[in-house]
């Protein structure tokens, strides 16, 4: 029961879309209505409002980190086990992808996944972030960097901790993240994907 309750709480935390919340508070258009239509920091940046994009990035990452950290810190005393913690990690990610508060129209989950990984293990999170930065620096594609980081994240965890239930959760998160980038994959293959720094009209 504890596992389910913590997972439900994590899903609700993940369902808070900071792209939508920040945009509304700052008088910007709904991120679903322009650019890629994705409620995430990259799309919010297309408005030209860097502050809004940064706040969105921080908020989405923080909710992933907070849900897992709180569960790991206080959950065991209430009956949460390793399987439950893995469920929490997956649930907060699913909340971001399919938010109940925003008609289940969520983002792609890159920032939230980063927060989750940092909470599971800071070294794991930083290693995955370093992978993103390296690919982004050399190729200038945010989506490609996210895809490569998603592929490596489960392997990093297994190398550090072996095959466990959390490895399974991270693998599922990675698969879902890659699936959410299917349009980006098509654009990358067609040579039509936007590079980092390019602006699109809102």
From Swiss-Prot:
Pathway stated in the Swiss-Prot or TrEMBL entry: Lipid metabolism; phospholipid metabolism
Enzyme class: transferase
Segments crossing the lipid bilayer: 2-22, 82-102, 119-139, 158-178
Record membrane topology: Multi-pass membrane protein
GO biological process: phospholipid biosynthetic process
Location(s) in or outside the cell: Cell inner membrane
Entry-linked InterPro entries: G3P_acylTferase_PlsY (IPR003811)
Highest rank taxon of the organism: Bacteria
EC number: 2.3.1.275
Pfam families membership: G3P_acyltransf
Single GO molecular function: acyl-phosphate glycerol-3-phosphate acyltransferase activity
Catalytic activity: an acyl phosphate + sn-glycerol 3-phosphate = a 1-acyl-sn-glycero-3-phosphate + phosphate
GO cellular component, one term: plasma membrane
Membership in a protein family: Belongs to the PlsY family.
Stored NCBIfam families: glycerol-3-phosphate 1-O-acyltransferase PlsY (TIGR00023)
Oligomeric and partner information: Probably interacts with PlsX.
Functional summary from the UniProt entry: Catalyzes the transfer of an acyl group from acyl-phosphate (acyl-PO(4)) to glycerol-3-phosphate (G3P) to form lysophosphatidic acid (LPA). This enzyme utilizes acyl-phosphate as fatty acyl donor, but not acyl-CoA or acyl-ACP.
Descriptive protein name: Glycerol-3-phosphate acyltransferase
Gene: plsY
